[in-house]
Amino acid sequence: MDDQDPGGISPLQQMVASGAGAVVTSLFMTPLDVVKVRLQSQRPTVASELTTPSRFWSLSYTKSPSTLQSPGKCLLYCNGVLEPLYLCPNGTRCATWFQDPTRFTGTLDAFVKIVRHEGTRTLWSGLPATLVMTVPATAIYFTAYDQLKAFLCGQSLTSDLYAPMVAGALARMGTVTVVSPLELVRTKLQAQHVSYRELAACVQAAVAQGGWRSLWLGWGPTALRDVPFSALYWFNYELVKSQLNGPRQKEQTSVGISFVAGGISGMVAATLTLPFDVVKTQRQMSLGAVEAMRVKPPRVDSTWLLLRRIQAESGTRGLFAGFLPRIIKAAPSCAIMISTYEFGKSFFHRLNQEQPLGH
């Protein structure tokens, strides 16, 4: 990405292209993400009583006498990428989907039951909030990747073969670090049913209770899922793309080739990192439940301990819960995202050739 090249792409143009890709991808893929997390949030048996908050996906709680002693439930009510939590006192707030609880036997069954009991709009619930988070995060991530890859190759710090893997891992780690506090704060806001205007107060309360490090409590499992995913994805994407391109130059990559390469790479990376996705869902669930019950947060279990616990309780299948919807989502979402991004870059490339940068 040479800024002196009239046909080059500026970082701002990269951000616009990736932001547009995030919007298109979210519109198409949010329903599959809803189903994926709903399946992951199920346990073999439903816990009816609260014991250790970090052990359950679905937690019962009872309000104190000062709050009318109304029993309720803290459920992971997924709304796409953000996977928020909702509090359900007496089932009144959660309406139909809480009063008529269902268990899903598979991906298709989940789609049918969600639409039947909660309505079609539920598959896209929370999309605006999803876009608020994903658009800037994706813009930062993809722009950082391209800039880092160009730097690594330009400075000969690593071979062209492994530059995408290193750049992808570094870009994702930086993005996760920036976004992780925002995701945790959003979970607290959802659990407490307060408005976004009270965001500052929510942050202050979290910092006062657990220090600044508390804002990154979900960083570990998120990084363990997203950083390897990113490294594997970009390595395979560039490799598959070069194979499909053949002797042609990289700049001549078509949208179709980007779509196929992105889909294959996303499917491989999603399969290998699925156990960490399950852990991330469970940890987010437990953190939200603790916040909802206004109790002192327990000691946070390590990612590896959670992996062993899930395997002990649910077997190896538990580590790959939501496999089908994650794969079904990962392949097309990665394909749509990267092809839209490449199309956007091609558009700006042609635009810059016709009207050189700086004029």
Swiss-Prot record:
Belongs to the mitochondrial carrier (TC 2.A.29) family. Residues 36-121, 186-214, 277-317 are mitochondrial matrix. The chain crosses the membrane at residues 15-35, 122-142, 165-185, 215-235, 256-276, 318-338. InterPro entries: Mitochondrial_sb/sol_carrier, Mt_carrier_dom_sf, Mtm1-like. GO terms for molecular function: 2 iron, 2 sulfur cluster binding; glutathione transmembrane transporter activity; metal ion binding. The lineage of its organism: Eukaryota, Metazoa, Chordata, Craniata, Vertebrata. It is a multi-pass membrane protein. It catalyses: glutathione(in) = glutathione(out). It holds the Pfam family Mito_carr. Signal peptide: none annotated. The keyword Hydrolase does not apply. It comes from the Eukaryota. This is Mitochondrial glutathione transporter SLC25A39. Solcar repeats lie at residues 9-151, 159-243, 253-347. Cleaved and degraded by AFG3L2; degradation by AFG3L2 is regulated by the ability of SLC25A39 to bind iron-sulfur. In absence of mitochondrial glutathione, SLC25A39 binds iron-sulfur, preventing cleavage and degradation by AFG3L2. The presence of mitochondrial glutathione prevents iron-sulfur-binding to SLC25A39, promoting cleavage and degradation by AFG3L2. It comes from Rattus norvegicus (Rat). Residues 1-14, 143-164, 236-255, 339-359 are mitochondrial intermembrane. The activity of SLC25A39 is regulated by levels of mitochondrial glutathione via its ability to bind [2Fe-2S] iron-sulfur cluster. Upon physiological levels of mitochondrial glutathione, glutathione prevents iron-sulfur-binding to SLC25A39 promoting cleavage and degradation by AFG3L2. Upon depletion of mitochondrial glutathione, SLC25A39 binds iron-sulfur, preventing cleavage and degradation by AFG3L2. One of its GO terms (biological process) is glutathione import into mitochondrion. [2Fe-2S] cluster binds at residues 74, 78, 88, 94. Mitochondrial transporter required for glutathione import into mitochondria. Glutathione, which plays key roles in oxidative metabolism, is produced exclusively in the cytosol and is imported in many organelles. Mitochondrial glutathione is required for the activity and stability of proteins containing iron-sulfur clusters, as well as erythropoiesis. Keywords: 2Fe-2S, Heme biosynthesis, Iron, Iron-sulfur, Membrane, Metal-binding, Mitochondrion, Mitochondrion inner membrane, Repeat, Transmembrane, Transmembrane helix, Transport. GO terms for cellular component: mitochondrial inner membrane; mitochondrion.
